[in-house]
Amino acid sequence: MSDSSEATVKRPLDAHVGPSENAAKKLKIEQRTQADGIHEADVGITLFLSPELPGFRGQIKQRYTDFLVNEIDQEGKVIHLTDKGFKMPKKPQRSKEEVNAEKESEAARRQEFNVDPELRNQLVEIFGEEDVLKIESVYRTANKMETAKNFEDKSVRTKIHQLLREAFKNELESVTTDTNTFKIARSNRNSRTNKQEKINQTRDANGVENWGYGPSKDFIHFTLHKENKDTMEAVNVITKLLRVPSRVIRYAGTKDRRAVTCQRVSISKIGLDRLNALNRTLKGMIIGNYNFSDASLNLGDLKGNEFVVVIRDVTTGNSEVSLEEIVSNGCKSLSENGFINYFGMQRFGTFSISTHTIGRELLLSNWKKAAELILSDQDNVLPKSKEARKIWAETKDAALALKQMPRQCLAENALLYSLSNQRKEEDGTYSENAYYTAIMKIPRNLRTMYVHAYQSYVWNSIASKRIELHGLKLVVGDLVIDTSEKSPLISGIDDEDFDEDVREAQFIRAKAVTQEDIDSVKYTMEDVVLPSPGFDVLYPSNEELKQLYVDILKADNMDPFNMRRKVRDFSLAGSYRTVIQKPKSLEYRIIHYDDPSQQLVNTDLDILNNTRAKESGQKYMKAKLDRYMPDKGGEKTAVVLKFQLGTSAYATMALRELMKLETSRRGDMCDVKENI
């Protein structure tokens, strides 16, 4: 763009198609049904920054390995999986003759053993001679016995346990029965000794197990490499296997489900050996790169993410300009001018009814309507849930619908379970209060997601209007972050329930740009932010934009200056988000291929496995030692992009600006196949 301050904008429909095709598309949009799902315009995504540049057609996420995400930590380091933990020390293998000789020696030692006379006398006073002889026999023969006497006093029992350990050199195990007698058996001295020797090899200077990773501390940080799973799902698997509560695991940000991702995770109150052992059972996930830390990770503890994206089946629809020229010019514009930092379509769900629509009803305290929207029989829902939705629509029998609802439908299950345990009114319906109770049974992070989606819809709509009115030109009344104000926006918030973009904004304030700021070139368009509606944000002093907040919320029977609610979860403080994002370190490659199932980029795990194989002299694939697979030619064309984005920015919005395509689930850019 020759003059970035005079940005022109068009709706996505007009980006790179001819007039006749454009008219056909407009007609198609007017005639679309619920089956089409949510489209960009439904959630405020309407403009491009560089509409004059041609885009290209292609599809993302045909395979989950087409979308790689690596977290960037607060020091700017890109997180990669470079090891798969450590191997536990192996017990030395011994011959059968050695084992038998050791057993014979051990048996002879036990036969010759005599309890210290003074300690034996104490045992006789407690148990009697007959039981002491039986205890000595247990020591020598590995039998078991139970004492004749019982001992009611706990302090006495404790002393007896200690006396037995002392008398028999910790080689007997004693337990108290329900009747307060003692059951005594011989412990396995060899296994205990070997275990202790193994542990001693892996302790730090303070005697704490560390497996060679330095001084032990309260938290273990590790890299999580996952495939085709979202972060919450992966964390739930780990906590279930370790049998620990979810609160002991923290992470800086959630990562895409349909992707291969790497991120740092912290865990507390768990041994490193137990954590490391997970790699034997994890599927589609692997952990490694451990280190000890004094502090846990928290949401927002990252600078952003690095993306490697494969766009397959690329065509231009333009015979006058080469693909190389289109991609080159598009990437240049994207690097220099950026893209509108819209909340992406992922924010609004994949069902026919957008999450922001449900969020609106929650903010209006329309509990029944919100619940009915969640449970409604829609065209675009999880297919396995359609029978349950049909039952609910026809019978309002919560218990019957619950039996058919798939467990993975968390919100629906919570609603139906709660309603099935409540009484109906005389007319056979549930009360508004019953629906409210059911809504509050939805996991908190999920029910707050709905209202955050509504905030995102408003933000997108305002951002489109801001660019439409003023392009990339800074104007008086725009908002920028006030770096002199360090006080938090809100206090006492549990960060487990907030997205990384919301969490980050809790610690910043904004101020309005003045004419003096503009004259001194103190700020650029990259500094401009817009608030999502809330009770603790500053709205733009530009009257047009401020009025737009009023108009949008008024249409939904709300007031941007009154966002507090009686229900704390739905009382929104608001947050700030930059209007423009510029990808960093943007590079591209054009690759040709034939097989649609051919993997075109390598994951961290691919690279690690083949690098290790090469170093150990084993068979390896040379093509899998680097991120990019070699171009072997073919009739199909793919564009591979690599770039970095800041916290909470959506890679699909950067791709949208480059390709000039609709990013909704049923749009031209997406061809989602769930398991490849």
Swiss-Prot record:
This is Multisubstrate pseudouridine synthase 7. Its EC number is 5.4.99.-, 5.4.99.27. Present with 4150 molecules/cell in log phase SD medium. PANTHER family: PSEUDOURIDYLATE SYNTHASE PUS7L (PTHR13326:SF21), TRNA PSEUDOURIDINE SYNTHASE D (PTHR13326). The active site is at D256. It is an enzyme of class 5 (isomerase). The lineage of its organism: Eukaryota, Fungi, Dikarya, Ascomycota, Saccharomycotina. It is found in: Nucleus; Cytoplasm. Residues 94-110 have a biased composition (Basic and acidic residues).
